[in-house]
């Protein structure tokens, strides 16, 4: 049972009454303190004036970060295949999208540089949005070398990077057909691929984190890490909109992280989550290799929950109209979720 009725002290959280009151836009102190300490432990930002601020999850955080820099008519750089909710968010704001080519590791740095170098729009490109780990929908994960290259292009063209990383802790080992040697080297926290935030020396990365994929999406609890002048503005935006995540949700997270688990217990929980998702990945890939061989191509993901199929059409079907509609109709008839 969670204890949310203690008074504030070292390693403890506020009393329940504190969580049930209105609060400021930075979050209840024990919740906010954990997210900041956790960010320092995992990402160790390389510049001094960084901070964290609460969010209702990464979509909420994305909107607030975007509104700090963008107005109607601006253009946002995104992955060639990007998170559908982002499209639904920016279109009503009359913000255009400039897609950047992807490969098996996500956004291609040379393609990003090409788009920026040859940009002819009236307004300057200022921001690039990417999901570097287990990208939604393709499942692509950037290596550390790819992240360094993307960051270098951002420096060259003076771009702000929105690092939307809800699947960051869902990294696991490469797939092996040898079921006896699976799940022996899960990364936990210490062996994760370093984040873009951890590479940032200029204060140009706005990192979005969430508990949605590792605790529960209904908690609506997340946080933003960025230079303090940005987190301060997001705090002010919170105070005129959401105020902060629901007090009960913050109480649950704060109690787990500060009293029940601590950082070591949190890492043990993440290892178990990584194991669970690795098992699901392996079972799904095993079945795909068994039943879909020759019908589709795919890259086996090393993180997250997405596997991106490329349907292999027979030569005589290529170029015909209506083929994908027939594929879709066949999936519906066979009760396959697309």
Regions of interest found by a model, annotated:
Residues 4-158, 162, 168-199, 277, ...:
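Conserved core of the PLP fold type I
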Residues 171, 227-228, 258, 310-312:
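Residue-level recognition of strand-loop junctions within catalytic nucleotide-signaling folds
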Residues 270-274, 278-285, 296-314:
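Conserved glycine-rich beta-strand-loop-beta hairpin in the small C-terminal domain of fold type I
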Residues 89, 152-153, 233, 276, ...:
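Alpha-helical scaffold elements within enzyme catalytic domains, especially in hydrolases
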Residues 99, 129-132, 162-165, 209, ...:
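Short beta-strand segments
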Residues 29-33, 148, 228, 247-251, ...:
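A structural signal for well-ordered alpha-helical segments within the folded catalytic domains
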